[in-house]
Amino acid sequence: MAITVEDRFAITELIAMHGHLCDSGELDRLGEVFTTDVTYDVPDFGQKIVGVTALAEAGRALGERNPVGHHVTNVVLSEQADGHVHARSKGIGIYANGTSGSVTYEDTVVRVENGWRISHRKTLARRAPLGG
């Protein structure tokens, strides 16, 4: 079954919601974005987090080192043979000291009882131009 325009809108909004929840400190609501057993893989920062509760705890542990703004852009969605959706997007993090960083998010998005959720996210730091 092809993903619909409504699905595309819902998934894009889901991806955007992550930044809003993090920036407002509403980490207990991350279950609205991720499955309870999400794998959040951040190899460039040396860790893999499993579970939405552990993800919220990791965010709290970062404390003041968290960005003040998570900005997601350039969302591209493609349906997979198993009905899941692969979502690729760019993230820009703005820190309190005015510096910024760029990442690529590679997400597996699955349909669950209450809508779409991210079941796997790989976050890759972008530190060199032209894919280097």
Where are these regions (language model features)?
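Short, low-complexity N-terminal intrinsically disordered segments enriched in polar/charged residues
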Residues: 1-24, 28, 32, 36
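Residue-level detector of alpha-helix boundaries and kinks
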Residues: 2-3, 15, 40, 62, ...
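Charge-dense, low-complexity intrinsically disordered segments
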Residues: 5, 46-49, 96
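Poly-acidic low-complexity segments
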Residues: 26-29, 41, 119, 123-126
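A solvent-exposed, acidic/Ser-Thr-rich amphipathic alpha-helical stretch
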Residues: 27-91
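A beta-strand edge to alpha-helix "cap/lid" segment located at domain peripheries
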Residues: 62-132
